Amino acid sequence: VLPGLTLLDLLLRHHPLAAVMTSPSNHTLLSQALAGKATCFMQSELPFLDAAKNPLPFSAPAGNGCALKHLVEKGIWDTWKQAGIEYVNVLNVDNILADPTDTSLAALAQAEGNEAVMRVIPRQNPQENVGVIVGEEGHWHIKEYTELTAQEKDLTQYLYASISFFCFSMSFIQKAAALSLPLHYVWKKIPGTSLSGWKCEYYIFDLLP
């Protein structure tokens, strides 16, 4: 990355069709800052739940599992399709070392005839807050770190970690938009309050075929 340039700056230099998923708390700010540079689309929210999983009067973003659905519903997929886009890199904003302009995953997907590929790295220690790569019955999927048992966190159990960097074909995105995903529950502090509750989220890795 060039000095003074963020990864988003780098992305927008090379891919003017970039899209950024926002939340209600930052949508206006990001939309104004990126006007004419990227398409901003806002994710939906879900309520926090109490210990008995009853809704509380507080909400939070529904998670990155909604991203592909929003791309289709908000017309962004149509725009990209008309522009001749075939593959889309999808990565989380907290992955600050990822290069959104990396075309190697798309090249791999095209060469191998795959509609969804992901980048993984070797795990470093059992306490890392990263999802782990699990192979079962010929399929690969990701298990979130908050849902791992002590045994599953052992480095000898699962060797590789997800860095939330995916590449999807446009046809896969269109199909994924119609899928129903399971909810994941994480006990968290509710921002702006002294309370804690179950935060409900959809995870994008549940879309993996």
Predicted regions and their residues:
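Short catalytic/ligand-binding loop motif for oxyanion handling, primarily in non-cytosolic enzymes
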Residues: 28-29, 48-49, 98
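N-terminal glycine-rich phosphate-binding loop and ensuing alpha1 helix
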Residues: 1-32, 36, 55-56, 60, ...
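Short, conserved secondary-structure transition motifs
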Residues: 22-25, 44-52, 123-129
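Soluble or luminal CAZymes and related metallo-dependent hydrolases
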Residues: 3, 63, 196-199
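A structural signal for isolated positions on well-ordered beta-strands in alpha/beta enzyme cores
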Residues: 17-19, 39, 89, 117
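Divalent-metal (Mg2+/Mn2+/Ca2+)-assisted nucleotide/phosphate chemistry catalytic cores
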Residues: 41-93
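Catalytic core of tubulin tyrosine ligase-like
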Residues: 77-92, 97-209
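Structural alpha-beta junctions
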Residues: 35-40, 111-115
